[in-house]
A protein has these predicted regions:
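Active-site pocket-lining/capping segments in soluble small-molecule metabolic enzymes
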Residues: 1-175
Length: 175
């Protein structure tokens, strides 16, 4: 949520980048990559930027690594660590054992709260008009609705937690 011009020292940090990287996010992403000790790329566009900048990077879902061929390809691109996707951990013990035997293969980035989906658009627009500033510009970071606890209720009554970030991206979680 901070301004990229704040230039915090992140040299000792591992920065896990967002799954979505819009064109308008490129400068912010580059700034984070240049200041971070290491970054975790969550899409191939970020991998391209990391390679251009020559920074140390890892790869995690939604970039899906489910076999040795993909692992070899990601390593060939320069990935130091590869995080296995949470979906794989629940389904295929044999494949996990094979991949986990390789150096630099880790479990999922966030196994405690697995995401079902990331939507590039804000689902709160279904409730009404977005928050705007004095000039009429939409300001997601100032939206009071996004700070409230929200759930998507499925037909069977299952309540899926929903979070909206400061850029208006919606995340729906499994639990």
């Amino acid at each position: 949520d901070a301004d990229p011009r704040g230039e915090l020292d992140l040299s000792d940090a591992v920065v896990v980048l967002d799954e979505v990287c819009r064109t308008c996010d490129a400068d912010w992403t580059r700034s984070l990559m240049q200041r971070a000790g290491r970054v975790v790329c969550r899409n191939l566009g970020q991998v391209v930027i990391a390679r251009e900048l020559g920074v140390t990077f890892d790869v995690a879902a939604p970039v899906f690594c489910a076999n040795r061929a993909t692992l070899t390809w990601l390593r060939g691109l320069g990935a130091g660590r590869v995080y296995l996707p949470a979906e794989l951990l629940g389904n295929d013990a044999e494949r996990i054992a094979e991949l986990a035997a390789e150096p630099g293969v880790w479990g999922p980035v966030d196994a405690d709260r697995p995401e079902l989906m990331v939507c590039e658009h804000c689902l709160l627009t279904a409730e009404g008009v977005c928050a705007t500033d004095a000039t009429g510009q939409v300001r997601c970071r100032d939206c009071l609705r996004r700070r409230q606890v929200r759930y998507l209720v499925e037909r069977d009554g299952t309540r899926l937690p929903v979070a909206i970030d400061a850029c208006g991206r919606t995340r729906i979680f499994l639990s």
